[in-house]
Structures are given as C-alpha cells and as structure tokens.
Regions:
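Bacterial N-terminal signal peptides
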Residues: 7-17
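Bacterial N-terminal signal peptides that target proteins for export
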Residues: 1-7
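Intrinsically disordered, low-complexity regions of eukaryotic proteins
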Residues: 2, 19-20
C-alpha cells in the first residue's frame, strides 16, 4: 500500500510538479504565527508553537496542532508541522501567476524554504484548485 501511494504521489508530482511553484513574493514576507503556547530559542534559532497553531506567510496558510521551525544561517526556515488523530495538518498556498491554489493535508507536513519542497507524511491528500473549484486530487 505504501509503495502504491508513493508511486501515485511521485507520478502526480512529476506530472504537475514542474509548473507548481508558490508565489515568489511569499519568500520575502514575514511569517506570522498564532498558537496557545510558543517558545523561541535564540541560540538554536528554533521556534516551537503548540495548540491550535495558525501560521501564515504571504499566501501560505498552515493549521496544525504543533509546529517546529528551525532557521539556518542564511535565514531559511525548515518547518515540521504535526497534527493529531482526527485533526490533520492543513496547508494552502497560491500558485505563481495563476488563479490556482494547492491544498495539502497529512498527519505531518515538512516544508523546506531552501529547496521549496514539502513532504506529506501519513494519510496524505493533495488537491489543486482552480479558483475555488477542485481540479485534481490525490490520496
């Protein structure tokens, strides 16, 4: 089952992956985080937020139970967002130059700003919306 899911997601990303780019302007926007609790470690350059977390950066919206963000020396963030049973992580972002969005849901989502890659782990769902209409979905 995992092999089949990996194959399906890989095929989908190969087919639609080349033109799927997030808004370039999002890279220069500040990240805003709301959560029940938040802790920042200035020495380690890590932020941990827990409890009804909502993070936004430009057109990026992410909702999770917990988020850990690590910042490298160039200021690029690596984010791990986790959900819980019945409450998966949700992510939505606009595609560059189009009236399209992609939405992702999974038990865990990892996002690397440096490579502009996201990784969906556990019960993953990926959707492409044109306007507000569902165009493609893979589970």
């Amino acid at each position: 089952m995992k092999t089949r899911l990996f194959f399906l997601i890989s095929a989908y990303l190969l087919w639609f992956g080349a033109p799927v780019h997030a808004e370039l302007a999002d890279r220069n926007k500040p990240m805003h985080i709301e959560a029940d609790t938040m802790r920042y470690d200035d020495i380690g350059k890590t932020t941990n937020a827990t409890g009804r977390v909502i993070a936004s950066k430009g057109t990026l919206l992410l909702r999770a139970d917990a988020i850990e963000i690590r910042q490298d020396t160039q200021g690029q963030n690596f984010m791990i967002a986790t959900g819980s049973t019945g409450n998966p992580v949700f992510m939505r972002q606009k595609r560059e130059g189009l009236n399209e969005f992609f939405e992702a849901q999974a038990n865990r989502i990892e996002r690397d700003e440096k490579t502009q890659m996201i990784r969906l782990i556990g019960k993953a769902v990926l959707r492409r919306l044109v306007g507000n209409a569902l165009a493609d979905e893979i589970q």
